[in-house]
Amino acid sequence: MPAGMFSIDSILAGRPSCKDSVLLHRNAPVVFSNLTESLYTAAGDFNGLYSHTGPPAPNLQSVNGRIGYNNYYYGQLHVQGPTGPACCGAIPTLGSQQCPCIPTGYDSAGSVLISPVPHQMMSYMNVGTLSRTELQLLNQLHCRRKRRHRTIFTDEQLEALENLFQETKYPDVGTREQLARKVHLREEKVEVWFKNRRAKWRRQKRSSSEESENSQKWNKSTKTTSEKIEEGKSDVDSDS
């Protein structure tokens, strides 16, 4: 078994986007991402971990020994009973509109929204064996975005970047490449840094402008109040 079978990269690489979630009706299969045959070969060792219940759904074709349709591969997932998945049945007070397994707008609990699962993790699964919490966790695992690697700049790199930013807010490609070689960074990292730095600079400029306007309004208001007080004193003196 490959050591990297369950690494984060291998798991995330096999996942389609959350937009590929499909609405499954009772006795319908769950759609798996269009993975390479090598993944299916490696996943064969895990077929015994999950029960394969029921016959394949109609209108499905066999592709290389796998059940497939429209460039998707299918693993059997059956909703138990016409009343909905087990997660809804476990809590009698939850109707089809309240159960998180059922998308809003569907009036039948016999349909359930399940996100595609990487085939190398789960060949076959029965929704009746999963609780509502497990279904939610499965969907969160699929939809969770991969975190981007954040670059940590050294003091020397930041100083060089800031110095160039004071000279020009929009350095051209050649200037960015020259600076990147100087501080041992990729040009793409320098470009992103300048993009973020310009956004910060605009926020600071806007904040400073708002503070200046507020200060002017306050000074004008104070001046008007002082003038009214002086006018009041003058009126009192004239009356006396």
From Swiss-Prot:
Keyword set includes Nucleus: yes
Taxonomic superkingdom: Eukaryota
Alphabetical GO biological process terms: anterior/posterior axis specification; brain development; dorsal/ventral axis specification; dorsal/ventral pattern formation; neural plate anterior/posterior regionalization; neuroblast delamination; otic vesicle development; regulation of epithelial to mesenchymal transition
Gene3D superfamilies for the chain: Homeodomain-like (1.10.10.60)
Main location group: nucleus
Keyword Nucleus tagged: yes
InterPro entries named among the record's database cross-references: Goosecoid-like_HB, HD, Homeobox_CS, Homeodomain-like_sf
SUPFAM superfamilies given in the database record: Homeodomain-like (SSF46689)
GO MF terms held by the record: DNA-binding transcription factor activity, RNA polymerase II-specific; RNA polymerase II cis-regulatory region sequence-specific DNA binding
Keywords annotated in UniProt: Developmental protein, DNA-binding, Homeobox, Nucleus
GO cellular component term of the entry, any: nucleus
Location in or out of the cell: Nucleus
Region annotated Disordered, chain positions: 199-240
PANTHER family hit by this protein: HOMEOBOX PROTEIN GOOSECOID, HOMEOBOX PROTEIN GOOSECOID-RELATED
Similarity comment: family membership: Belongs to the paired homeobox family. Bicoid subfamily.
Protein name per the record: Homeobox protein goosecoid
Source organism per UniProt: Danio rerio
Gene field: gsc
